[in-house]
Amino acid sequence: MKNSDDSGYTGKHVGVCVLDTGIFPHIDFTGRILAFQDFIGHRIRPYDDNSHGTHVCGIIGGDGRASEGRIKGIAPGCSLIVLKVLDRTGNGRKEDVLQAFRWILENKRYYGIRVVNISVGTTCRRAEDHRVLIAGVEQLWDAGLVVVAAAGNQGPKARKCDSTGKQPEDYHSRLQRSAYRTDCHIRQGTYL
């Protein structure tokens, strides 16, 4: 993102926890990956066998070192806490996501976590599975964390945010970012 630091906000002293496929220790994250927890392969060192997690972390907190400051994330000074909940194909299990939520609640103070980015969607069909995941997100919000969640790629029809078919107002506690496709163009939803 160009000119993200024009506002003066850099994310310094803000811990951003990213749930995704992991993180590659790229030069743009030097000294700012505070923690890495692997709920899939249980490895110790940061890695990303898919690249989606690294991409998301770059959008959030890349500091532009590799591009000599030309391309940065939206919070180039933030600390990154990365929880790998998706495998190399981008798939994951509800149980791993819920375990990651518990980890965040147990460690938020230690790592200074203030924002949680959940870059996962769901193809769950059972309403109970959705209720459990939404309850977990609500717990994070109730603990004082800002939760930013992907709207998902599985929306059943235009203007729906996720695979449950819930409208944005059904999720009062999380911020959603989404786009939808119409006539081969990607557009931001009008409800944002």
Predicted regions and their residues:
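Short, well-ordered turn and helix-capping elements at secondary-structure junctions
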Residues: 2, 43, 63, 122, ...
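Subtilisin-like serine protease catalytic core
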Residues: 4-17, 21-35, 43-95, 111-114, ...
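Short, solvent-exposed loop/turn and secondary-structure capping segments
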Residues: 26-31, 160, 183-185
